[in-house]
Amino acid sequence: MTTSLYKSQITMFIVMVIIGMLFNPMNILAYRFTDLYISHTLFYGGVLMASNMIWGHEIVHYLSMGHFNMLSFSIGIALSISTSILLLREQLLVDDNQWLRRMIPHHSTALTTSHKIYNRTTNPNIKALSREIINTQEKEILLMKSML
C-alpha cells in the first residue's frame, strides 16, 4: 500500500468517526442543544459507526472489483467488532466526569420522547408516567450539570 493511499484511508476513517459522533442518533434526540457533550463513550460510538461504514464500503468495492477475500474480511470485521465492544462495553478511560458527560444527553433524550408522547397520548397512565419521567429527568440533568 502506498503512503498516500494509507494517509487517505486514515483521513477517511477520522472523518467518518467525526461524522459518527456528530450524527449519533441519541444526539439528534437531545431535548436541548446545551445538553450535548463530547465524551469518550460518544467517541467510541463514532469509532463503531465509522468501522461499519468502512466495512460496508469495502464489501461493495471489493465485490464489484471481484477481489473479495473472505479471510481478510472475517479477520477485519472480527477486529472491528471486538475493539468496538471492548471500548463501549468496558468503558475504557471513562471516569466520573466522562460518565456525566454521556449521561446528560442520554437523559435529555428521555425528555424529548416523553414530551412528545405526553402531548400525543390520551392514555392517562402513559400521560402520568411521561410527566413523572420529565420531572425526574429535569432534576437529574440539573444535578449532573452541577457535578461537572
Model features per residue range: what roles?
Residues 1-148:
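His/Met- and acidic-residue-enriched segments that coordinate or traffic transition-metal cofactors
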